[in-house]
Amino acid sequence: MIYSSAENKKVKEYKKLKQKKYRDKTKMFLVEGQHLVEEAYKNGQLQELLLEEETNYNLDIKTIYLTKPIMKSISSLTTPPKIMGLCKKNVVKI
């Protein structure tokens, strides 16, 4: 399935993750780019793989396809990558 609407509930949640308050509340964050996605996957933090439509990348995890304008709207970078990941924050108690 490809999400193409900015009004989609999941897309709105991804956009909210730009706010620190929302990241802290949900204990989730986005990583951008293949290297960071792979590191998050290796560490068990990756919850969802976000790919620009027609991008081929295989990980054994839930994959969401987004249109280029949607990827741009949720990215914090000037040039958004074709690969992003939704990650869970690890809470370390001291």
Feature-to-residue mapping (PLM):
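N-terminal positively charged helical leader segments and presequences
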Residues: 1-80
